[in-house]
Amino acid sequence: MSRTYTTTAIVLKATPLGEADRLLTLLSPDQGLLRVVATGARKPRSKLGGRTALFVVGDCLIACGKSLDRLQQVETLTSHTALSGDLARLAAAQYLTELVLAQALERHPQPELFALLCRDLARIETQSGLEVLPYLLQSTWQLLAWAGWAPQTHYCCLTQQAVQPRLEQSRWRVRYSPSLGGVLADTAAYQRRPNQRELLLTATELAALQQIPTSQTVLPLASLPREAWQMLERALRHSAEYHLERPLQSALLLETLLTGSHVASV
């Protein structure tokens, strides 16, 4: 049996290990989630230093180990360095990465998940400030759909009654329940638990949410006010958190940016 193997992978997480090493969490299309040690990667002149930074995609040569495999060589394919140049881009990238980390399986091929993440990071990298939001929401929806968690937005998740946004009625609202799986018709009744999340969406917000999975292009940022984008992000995030059974830590930075008056570059 070979003691080494090669794979293409993206760095999802990198933490210091010992005096000079780096512990990496990688996602590979043919190996799934991998945890490997990059020996000496934190040394000033290490060839692995920049090649093991977050979001770097590379062809890797990995040696099998007793407890952890060791990364021996990396040939960088894409570095995504622009993601760290803008707080909104960085927050969106961390958001998607956290979702992927929660869904990926160790040592299990997941080419579609790998392709989705690489495509989404490349798209976000070309945006600035709040322009990342439409791309983030579409990417989040597709990751939820990949896992079988996409919310139901065209039909009531309890009665299966069609739900149409009444755009002519400014006060119209529809209930959105992450735990029940989507929107609720006016006639839908259930015993709501005290800690059960439920949001109220406007007609405009529901119409936009219904377009996200079917639109061939990303919705323009100017098509909705900031408050609407914030509500849509919250709805999809709550759906993800319900299935993951834990909060998305990276959403804190994104929410701060959404509620702030500007988005800064770093």
Swiss-Prot record:
> What cellular-component terms does GO give this entry?
bacterial nucleoid
Gene Ontology BP terms: DNA recombination; double-strand break repair
Any Pfam family hit = RecO_C
| Annotated InterPro entries | ARFGAP/RecO, DNA_rep/recomb_RecO_N, NA-bd_OB-fold, RecO, RecO_C
Going by the UniProt record, its keywords in alphabetical order are: DNA damage, DNA recombination, DNA repair
Question: What does the protein in this record do?
Answer: Involved in DNA repair and RecF pathway recombination.
The record's family statement is:
Belongs to the RecO family.
Name of the molecule in the record = DNA repair protein RecO
**Annotated gene:** recO
